[in-house]
Regions:
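C-terminal motif of bacterial Sec signal peptides marking the signal peptidase cleavage site
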Residues: 15-16
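Short, linear, compositionally biased motifs with a strong N-terminal bias
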Residues: 10-12
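Sec-dependent signal peptide recognition
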Residues: 2-8
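Glycan-recognition and catalytic cores of secretory/periplasmic carbohydrate-active enzymes
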Residues: 21-410
Length: 410
């Protein structure tokens, strides 16, 4: 009798584990099934929007979806826009998950227009544009043409490095306001440089990326490990002139997507260098995010952790998606808290799936609703934005790979 009960208990345990594993995997497969239908709808929406482009817009290479405008229309942007690489990146992720050449051909089509950015020395967003598009394409196809474009892009990006400052300059605009602005977002563009160092054998790319990351640790973070958005430097002395926000609530507030950029960036920097200060920084940022008294129970933050009218403030789904991506990878390195990091990432994906997803064959083909571009300037507030979708698919891929292969690296 005892043996029978033991066998029954063991069977129930295995059944429970199998059910949980299947349920966890289902969130990935179901979301990719949804995304396949939704992105096919997006192609129709894009074609419709393209039909209304002016000759000037066509000449300026307007092609990629970015967000839904206040009037409900689909906004398409040119390759020079910092968001131009996310939609082709989504298509590469669809190809990676499905293996269907339909997505590969579409990814190739939407990646091609970004090539002209490889010589654009006026942008720091080369990683967002080129690594998300050509980077994923090269990883999945091995196309040597893509490799050459990426190396040229990396060479262009490092022309913005200011040796006296120890950082890559971010924006060129508002020169009456800033001398050498560096934004926390720029941590995300370092991955292209680490890749270029390995691919070319030239250490200059890695050295610049490491210097930028170290300088950012020194000057961007407060004592509680929340991050400023913009740090402005004197180009002659390298001294800090100002610490500001541009997209957050105030200069001393914690803009939620900025915290996510930092977390993702330092997790990636640890992967590429093995330097403990980068892992420590990522862990500190996690501590700030998840100890914030304003973080909602569903782990989808308000657009700024210090926004004045919480809980009556918009959420930023994009910040949650980026955070989930970082947590899956961080769980590989921070062994002591691995389960906690993964559980939090899983909870974020569950929240996004249940409560923030777009309606099928609606919402101009976007996957997620309720992101905020810049609450400070009332721009792209509580709307679908393309980078939320990109990092949502990335997080799903990382979850699937982590559970199947024990690694979140794509």
């Amino acid at each position: 009798m005892k043996l029978q009960l033991g066998l029954l208990s063991t069977a129930l345990l295995f059944a429970s584990c199998a059910t949980k594993s299947t349920a966890e995997q289902d969130i990935v497969s179901e979301n990719f099934e949804f995304s396949a239908s939704q992105l096919k709808h997006a192609f129709t929406e894009i074609d419709s929007a393209r039909a209304h482009l002016t000759e000037k817009q066509i000449a300026n290479n307007v092609f990629a979806p970015r967000n839904i405008e206040p009037d409900g229309s689909l906004r398409l942007v040119a390759s020079r826009d910092w968001c131009s690489g996310f939609f082709p990146g989504e298509l590469w992720y669809m190809y990676e998950y499905t293996g269907d050449d339909f997505w590969k051909e579409k990814a190739i089509e939407f990646t091609a227009p970004v090539e002209r950015e490889k010589t654009n020395g006026g942008t720091h967003d080369m990683g967002f544009k080129v690594y998300c598009s050509f980077g994923n394409g090269y990883r999945l196809t091995g196309d040597s043409t893509y490799r050459d474009i990426m190396l040229e892009s990396a060479s262009t990006l490092i022309t913005r490095y200011k040796d006296k400052v120890g950082c890559i300059r971010s924006w060129d605009h508002n020169k009456d306001k800033w001398q050498c602005p560096v934004i926390i977002d720029n941590m995300m563009n370092l991955e292209l440089l680490f890749w270029a160092a390995k691919e070319s054998g030239d250490s200059i790319y890695r050295d610049i990326a490491v210097n930028h990351a170290l300088t950012t640790i020194k000057n961007h973070f407060r004592d509680d490990y929340s991050s400023y958005h913009v740090v402005d430097y004197d180009t002659i002395t390298g001294d800090v002139l100002h610490k500001h926000t541009h997209q957050g609530y105030s200069h001393e507030s914690a803009w939620s997507r900025g915290q996510a950029w930092g977390l993702y960036g330092y997790t990636m920097c640890y992967r590429e260098t093995g330097r403990e200060e980068f892992l420590d920084q990522a862990k500190h940022i996690v501590g700030y995010i998840f100890n914030s008294p304003t973080l909602p129970e569903d782990l989808v933050p308000y657009w700024d952790y210090n926004a004045p009218n919480i809980p009556d403030e918009p959420r930023d789904v994009s910040a949650a998606a980026v955070t989930a991506c970082a947590l899956y990878e961080l769980s590989m390195y921070d062994k002591e808290n691995a389960t906690l990091h993964k559980d939090r990432a899983d909870r974020i994906l569950e929240s996004l799936t249940k409560n923030y997803r777009a309606s099928l064959n609606n919402d101009r083909g976007f996957l997620l609703l309720h992101s905020v571009g810049s609450g400070n300037s009332n721009s792209e507030v509580d709307v679908p934005i393309i980078y939320a979708d990109y990092y949502f698919l990335e997080a799903l891929l990382k979850k699937a790979k982590l559970e199947k292969e024990g690694t979140a690296l794509l």
